Amino acid sequence: MKNLNLISFISLLLIMSFYRCDKQSDEFISDLDTTSFVEAFLAFVFDQDVEELVDDAFAQESYSSKTSDISTSGISAKGPKRNFKGDRYGKCATITVDEENNIKTVFFDGECFGKRGQTRTGTIVITYSETKGEIGSFRQVEFDNYFLNDVQIEGVRRYEVIGIEEGVDKTIQMTLENGKMTYPDGSFSTRSKSITKYISYEGEERVSTSVTGNASGVNSDGSAYDMEITSPILFTKECAKELMHKKGKIPVSGVKRIVKGETEMIINYGDGECDFVAEVTKDGVTETIDLKEIKRKRKFRKLKS
């Protein structure tokens, strides 16, 4: 009789254990996938990276006296060949200037390792206006087989100055058409956007960038989304070195709203502290995340799909 009771008790424990495991498995499966968030985040910081690189391409004053004739991936450029100051984007990153046609071409000859640990390959072609730093002046950026951290970047980006304050600080309208990011696993996301950037300077040095605007597109899982910045997203020079990371420049504050169908997600980048922390809120539940660590195709711990 005692043996029978013992067997029954053990059987009950096993049943409860299986039930608990199944329940935990169901809860894990229902946890919200991080892919949409990470793709939106990468798109945002990669744009900042491209903009900074383009600014640096225009900031280089010294170049070799030799005229180069370079051809990479079907794109050729003839003109003075320059290097980025301090090999910031790797020793194999060079700039050629076609002053007659107002074109700068940035070549990454092989896999170039930058100061932040980022890798780049391919070509960036920058067309620019005759005027610089004035209302109406512009830069247009296109890519040829360009990869940043093994993610292929495509699309046409246009930056146009629409306002100047005190002769220094600028308001820039940025648009993206046919934007596409292809990930190492072959999946891709698409997007278009229109944003406004207010850039504050001290002398010729950028102190901060405040970003507003919206975007829309399709994630790699095939779901359409809309993004709106509801509180300006801020990047600062003060935190730039502390927040250096291979994913790109990390914002210190600002809020954006992402809507997929009937699902809404709020991302809060903080209140100005120099950290990698952000808060993601869905259905009234908030999860704190580390922007250095989060990756695509993982699960949030608290947020449910």
Predicted segments with their positions:
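Bacterial Sec-dependent N-terminal signal peptides
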Residues: 1-30
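Low-complexity, intrinsically disordered segments exposed to solvent
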Residues: 23-305
